[in-house]
Curated annotation (Swiss-Prot):
Zn(2+) binds at residues 131, 135, 205. The chain crosses the membrane at residues 7-26, 30-49, 148-168, 180-200. It comes from Acaryochloris marina (strain MBIC 11017). Its EC number is 3.4.24.-. Its cofactor is Zn(2+). Belongs to the peptidase M48B family. Its main location: membrane. Keywords: Cell inner membrane, Cell membrane, Hydrolase, Membrane, Metal-binding, Metalloprotease, Protease, Transmembrane, Transmembrane helix, Zinc. It is found in: Cell inner membrane. It is a multi-pass membrane protein. The active site is at residue 132. InterPro entries: HtpX_protease, Pept_M48_protease_HtpX, Peptidase_M48. Pfam families: Peptidase_M48. This is Protease HtpX homolog.
Length: 293
């Protein structure tokens, strides 16, 4: 059911991109361009989603001799989860955050910021890395990257057309264009894309948290890490293209009155509460083994 829901939401994002092209560019030409753009965006996201996301945050590939402790922790967790070793990247930022990307476990990558490596104790770092491995195991990375790429394409299209209206008005559109519809789409298309992203991202964070907690056996360590990361994000948010925010373990802060509606993640406190509840369950059943969720 979750896979069907995700496929439906990605289909709606593609349809939104096609509809946006029709409304923004005008007429049948806009429709044809939208279909082509949607096809190219999905194909590009399939093959290059990892590089697109990593480039968005200027992540730099690191070798085992450059980050031996990071490699050792990820390798141990990957073996425990029966996953291939992902490529590891470090983001040159003092903000504390992390994400995973890649179309499948064989093409996966994990990126962490310099700030996260400096800030977290060993057990909490392990929890964060396990969370990212959980996204890889649960095949969330491709879904999130495709959604981010589609949303980014919609936002870019709307922005380009808004510039066109600003400088040239509606004179450049053909007879089939609808200036009022185009103006509405400039506002509504990116907003709708964001809302569809929410439907894809929110439930996956809970699942990745639980998978990570079972993998490490330390739900409290991940809960403490989330608390630290949330506090850090309020003071020092990681920049980058907002379309890729759903990939991050902690959502960048937004205005308080919009937070519940437009955040791509469930609230950090809800995630912490679930982890602490899971800790109680694991303590009552100490022999429970890690399983793929």
């Amino acid at each position: 059911m979750n896979q069907l829901k995700t496929a439906s939401l990605l289909g709606l994002l593609s349809a939104l991109l096609i509809g946006s092209s029709y409304a923004l560019l005008g007429g049948s030409g806009g429709m044809v361009m939208g279909i082509g753009l949607a096809a190219l965006t999905n194909l590009g996201a399939w093959y290059y989603s990892d590089q697109i996301a990593l480039s968005a945050y200027q992540a730099q590939l690191v070798r085992p001799n450059q980050a031996p402790h990071l490699y050792a922790v990820v390798q141990r967790l990957a073996q425990r989860a029966n996953l291939p070793m992902p490529r590891l990247y470090i983001i040159p930022s003092s903000a504390a955050n992390a994400f995973a990307t890649g179309r499948d476990p064989d093409h996966a990558a994990i990126a962490v910021t310099e700030g996260l490596l400096r800030m977290l104790p060993a057990a909490e770092l392990e929890g964060v890395l396990a969370h990212e491995l959980a996204h890889i195991q649960n095949r969330d990375t491709l879904t999130q990257a495709v959604a981010a790429t589609l949303a980014g394409a919609i936002a870019f299209l709307a922005q380009m057309v808004s510039y066109s209206f600003w400088f040239f008005g509606s004179r450049g559109n053909d007879r089939e264009s609808n200036p009022i519809g185009a103006l509405l789409m400039i506002v509504l298309a990116p907003l709708s894309a964001t809302i569809l992203q929410l439907g894809i991202s929110r439930t996956r964070e809970f699942s990745a948290d639980e998978t990570a907690a079972r993998l490490t056996g330390q739900p409290r360590a991940l809960a403490q890490a989330l608390s630290r990361l949330e506090s850090n994000a309020q003071r020092n948010a990681l920049g980058g293209n907002p379309a890729f925010a759903p990939l991050l373990i902690i959502n960048p802060p937004v205005r308080q009155w919009l937070s519940n509606l437009f955040t791509t993640h469930p609230s950090t406190q809800d995630r912490i509460n679930r982890l602490l509840k899971l800790e109680q369950q694991l303590q009552r059943r100490p022999s429970i083994a890690f399983t793929s969720l």
